[in-house]
């Protein structure tokens, strides 16, 4: 919604832009309210293997918070150089209090959570429910609602069967 406010400033229509922001936020909270009966309290892990210049975790973490999901950990895959790892740790820490752990430390955790959101397919474990986070995220209110719906539907799938869903 930041872009709406910026557009309002550019067009000298701040009040109108703020009205649009409120409408968009109402849509997000209304949808989140519908699916929270399933998402609330569910345990998840976010696995990240992309550099910060290609993946910004803030939107994902904000959506998980809106759905009242419990982020057990952020797992950073082993493909980071020290500089890129530091940048991602700073970006994640600014948004989330969950522990940030490496791939090895997170292996067992993957099997105990309700959902794994990941930038890279985890192919060595077919039992976990995964949502693949694309390079280009869905945008806008409709994009976030589509992402929340994907989380909801993945959590609603019957049984313990894993698999991967592409947003």
Where are the language model's segments positioned?
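An N-terminal assembly and electron-transfer interface module characteristic of large anaerobic redox
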Residues: 1-167
